[in-house]
């Protein structure tokens, strides 16, 4: 049996030969790795360095070696260099046209690469001395480039490349994505008629984006007040693509539009149909909750209680089930049924202790918050996932980068039964390595890998990975100076930036606590601090100190954490308006009547995260009954 790190030994022997100028010996070692270790996470690197070794040895097989690497790892970090060196190798063999085509791939697919300028220079030189054929870069390259530009918010550049795609004889290969993306670009610019045209061209293709296009068509129809067309699009989406995550959302939006214009009966009917059809989805479970809400707003508390109890049963395992049981308890209180109220609160508190309404229910009952902890070990036995075994060996040897690479490979290769445990290890690795944003995202992937109803019952290590104590010394110091709860601040930072100090929002908010420059400067003056420049805004200590000052000011102004968080998210002027619209509303009702869904969710999520931080790190994480 080979040692666990045998592939690493062979790989680094090849690297040593390469560094010593013994290129053919290096190529032989990389060949050995590729032949003997078919599950090695180093195969991509071995392919690349094999090609580089052959090129350095001026072996005529070098172009084919680069091609082999690019076929399998065309989007890898070494791809721009591989295309450039492939061009160099082809030039050396007098294959000018093929060399030019290799160079062309770099500025199209890797414009920001340091090899892009060199590739353009070589193309200029070749064009001066040879007659080059037309650019035959595959249409997929321009489509992928357009997607990258689109995701970066550069709509104009994306549009230009998509037009190039459409002019190609092979445009049909990517028509679905092209039509959809052009529709979204028009939607962004509020050119809804043109957006509709693109989406309607995409839907009949019945490919990857057909459900997305139907969803956008639903939204466009609602914007235009065409509820009938919106319902037709949403119904088609739910019928043709019932497994799409957008299926329930489209119907929900139509029902919501009906409720907003006062057609509560029609809205209630559609909410009920949507919820009962998609009870375990986010929007289906929310639709079930909305049925009870509409009934309660008209004073029909008994019917509302029944609707919420039914919603809690149908959407069991979802976050919405917790809110349904909580509001079923409130409705039961309204009709004088203390027994039903107590039972419903208890269900929310014990089954969904990690949710906002589960935590609120525990507070109503005067019981400590408890969250279900999975007692099973998160450890994966040796031999089950070879890449994980290599991670353990490398980690013990303090080979940090290689160890992390093996753990990343293990997260992709692990059997389904072990994937959540491997992802949890990777999450902790990222957080301990100074990347809590990536750590939280990976922990959420781990939670999702478990599936329902497991998301509310996790190993303790996974709970801690979901709620890491990043920047904790800075948070506690700033909280103490401002007289704030450090756990509330941790919850706010987790939701604002996921602890990424360099985060910058589309609106121009900076840093851990997402401060607008003007707000940061005025707060700095009030605290007797120098006004921060852009560098100061992303400095963790400065950002947290100023963010604590902003949050403290809102707490002083409004006196309640829900109102302060609403002001932090949407501004104090809007909070005052909402308070005038609903005078005397208690905290629960106030939150649910906020017209901005983002702010409603923000208040709940920040307070839920704060409660989880207290449970984990202050209260000693008492567990719910197993």
Please tell me what each predicted stretch does:
Residues 1-507, 513, 523-532, 549-552, ...:
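Acidic, polar-rich low-complexity tracts and alpha-helical solenoid repeat scaffolds
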Residues 560-561:
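Short loop-to-helix capping motifs
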Residues 571-572, 584-585, 593-610:
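CBM-like carbohydrate-recognition segments
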């Amino acid at each position: 049996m080979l040692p666990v790190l045998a592939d690493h030994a062979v790989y680094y022997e090849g690297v040593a030969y390469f560094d010593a100028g013994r290129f053919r010996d290096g190529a032989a070692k990389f060949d050995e790795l590729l032949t003997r270790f078919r599950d090695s996470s180093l195969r991509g690197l071995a392919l690349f360095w094999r090609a580089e070794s052959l090129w350095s040895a001026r072996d005529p097989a070098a172009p084919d070696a680069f091609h082999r690497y690019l076929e399998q790892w065309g989007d890898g970090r070494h791809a721009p260099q591989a295309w450039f060196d492939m061009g160099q190798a082809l030039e050396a063999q007098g294959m000018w046209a093929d060399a030019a085509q290799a160079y062309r791939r770099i500025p199209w697919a890797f414009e920001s690469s340091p090899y892009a300028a060199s590739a353009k220079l070589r193309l200029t030189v070749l064009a001066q001395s040879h007659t080059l054929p037309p650019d035959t870069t595959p249409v997929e390259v321009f489509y992928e480039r357009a997607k990258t530009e689109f995701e970066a918010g550069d709509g104009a550049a994306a549009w230009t490349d998509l037009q190039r795609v459409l002019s190609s004889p092979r445009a049909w290969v990517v028509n679905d994505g092209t039509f959809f993306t052009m529709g979204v670009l028009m939607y962004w610019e509020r050119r809804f008629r043109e957006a509709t045209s693109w989406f309607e061209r995409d839907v009949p293709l019945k490919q990857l984006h057909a459900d997305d296009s139907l969803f956008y068509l639903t939204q466009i129809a609602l914007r235009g007040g065409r509820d009938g067309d919106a319902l037709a699009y949403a119904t088609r989406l739910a019928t043709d693509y019932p497994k799409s995550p957008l299926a329930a959302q489209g119907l929900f939006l139509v029902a919501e539009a009906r409720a907003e214009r006062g057609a509560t009966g029609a809205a209630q009917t559609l909410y009920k149909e949507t919820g009962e059809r998609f009870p375990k989805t986010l929007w289906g479970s929310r639709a079930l909750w909305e049925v009870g809400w509409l009934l309660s707003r008209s004073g029909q508390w008994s019917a509302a209680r029944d609707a919420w109890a039914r919603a809690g049963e149908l959407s069991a395992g979802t976050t919405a089930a917790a809110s349904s049981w909580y509001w079923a308890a409130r409705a039961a209180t309204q009709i004088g049924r203390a027994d039903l109220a107590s039972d419903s609160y208890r269900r929310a508190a014990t089954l969904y202790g990690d949710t906002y309404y589960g935590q609120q229910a525990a507070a109503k009952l005067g019981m400590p918050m408890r969250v279900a902890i999975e007692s099973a070990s998160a450890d994966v036995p040796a031999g089950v996932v070879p890449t994980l075994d290599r991670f353990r060996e490398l980690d013990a040897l303090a080979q940090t980068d290689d160890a992390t690479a093996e753990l990343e490979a293990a997260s992709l290769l692990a059997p389904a039964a072990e994937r959540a445990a491997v992802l949890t290890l990777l999450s902790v690795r990222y957080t301990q390595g100074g990347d809590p944003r990536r750590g939280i995202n990976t922990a959420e992937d781990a939670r999702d890998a478990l599936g329902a109803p497991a998301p509310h019952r996790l190993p303790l290590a996974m709970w801690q990975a979901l709620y890491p104590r990043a920047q904790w010394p800075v948070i506690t110091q700033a909280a103490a100076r401002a007289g704030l709860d450090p756990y509330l601040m941790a919850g706010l930072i987790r939701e604002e930036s996921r602890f990424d100090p360099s985060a910058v929002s589309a609106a121009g908010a900076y840093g851990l606590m997402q401060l607008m420059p003007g707000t940061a400067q005025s707060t700095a003056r009030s605290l007797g601090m120098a006004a921060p420049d852009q560098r100061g805004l992303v400095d963790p200590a400065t950002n947290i100190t100023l963010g604590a000052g902003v949050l403290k000011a809102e707490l002083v102004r409004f006196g309640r954490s829900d109102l302060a968080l609403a002001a932090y998210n949407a501004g104090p002027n809007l909070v005052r308006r909402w308070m005038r619209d609903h005078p005397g509303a208690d905290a629960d009702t106030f939150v649910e009547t906020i017209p901005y869904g983002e702010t409603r969710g923000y208040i709940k999520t920040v307070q839920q995260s704060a409660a989880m931080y207290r449970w984990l790190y202050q209260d000693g994480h008492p567990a719910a009954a197993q």
